[in-house]
Amino acid sequence: YSLVHDIKDVFSAATKYGPEMMWSFNSNFNDMATDPHIWSDMDGWGDESADPIWVQNYPDQPRKYAYIQITNASGKTYLELGNLPGIKKYQYDTPEDFDAGRSIINIPVIRYADVLLMFAEADNMANGGPSQAGVDAINQVINRANNYVVNAADPLASLSMSKTDFDKKVIQE
């Protein structure tokens, strides 16, 4: 397994069985039980929407704008309209599927990024603080989230972090 290089490709139809997806629910709009009922026609009321507090606390980085639909086409926030922000991954469907409110993009359960973060957290707890292996694991996720450029809003983890600070960083990711 490996991370998909470009954050915008994590949820594309081309990578739904890609190197990052370890376990997912298959989505098929011909079977209503597996169609995720995307939020496009429902302004955030599909099967997957984002909690407003989570959206507000999300670091300002490329990943935020690749994953979350915060405004509608006219620029109003979904909260202003009385709705929840949408999970933007469905905008990577074909225009026909998106316009019809359906999707063939699988719903991820565990991605390789999740495993890297679980390892970093477990390693931190087992060692009483971050190790180089744990720092390297979380930094793979952070680097990809920031499109591989330094971002003061989401800095890399380091060995100098305390066990508590490193744990908070992993949980934030």
Task: Specify the residue positions occupied by each region the protein language model found.
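Acidic/polar-rich alpha-helix caps and helix-coil junctions
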Residues: Y1-N30, P62-E173
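His/Glu-based metal-binding/catalytic segments typifying zinc-dependent metallopeptidases
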Residues: G18-P19, N26-W54
